[in-house]
Structure formats: structure tokens, C-alpha cells
Amino acid sequence: MALLRRPADMDERTWLARWHGNHTPVAIATQSTFTYVQNYVVRAITEDAPVINAIVEEHFPPIEAVTSLHAFFGAADDADLQSRMEQMVASTAAFGANVNIDAVPTSRYNFRSPFFSA
């Protein structure tokens, strides 16, 4: 999960266009994600909430993606990894997601419901 903040010197329309229009296809093409959920934060619920403009949820299939850049990016070899990383760095920098970002590793577990049979 990543918490994004829009750079103060970038207007909202440009930021959203670069994030949704330009970055999204790059993120999908260069990483081994099977889910990419973009949540745009329109307002804070409490007065003293920190500024967060977006919450991104990404799901990576192999546990190896936690410790291996090759697995994280779905790279076939070192050259492919380098290319994918360069694309991501350029793409995130274009809308300010290369600075002032919080990344929170999480896990997802599916439990059976005691109320429904599978």
C-alpha cells in the first residue's frame, strides 16, 4: 500500500492526468502486480488528518517480490530489470510519487466465513 501526496507546485488536474493517464499503464506493464487499485482522496474526515491525496493498493503474486527486485518487477533478467526500474523511476517522478510517499507492506489473508459454506 502506498500513500501519495501531490506536490505543492503541481495543480490537481495535471497531477491526476499524469498519475492516471501516464503512470498507470507504466506501473501495470513494469511490475508483477495482479491488482492495482487507485483511491483518490477527496477530503479528510478529521480536521487534524495528515495530507494524503491518494491511497494505492497493489497485489504481487509471489512472496519473493518482498525480497527480490526481479520478482517485484517481473523481470526476466538484469537488463529487463534495469529497463523496468528506469521506466518506473521516470514515471513516478513525473507526478511527484518519487518523494514524500509512504509505502506500507501488508499481507492479505482469506478466511472462511463461519456463516457460509464453501
Q: Across the structure, where does each feature detected by a protein language model lie?
A:
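Macromolecular interaction modules
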Residues: M1-A118
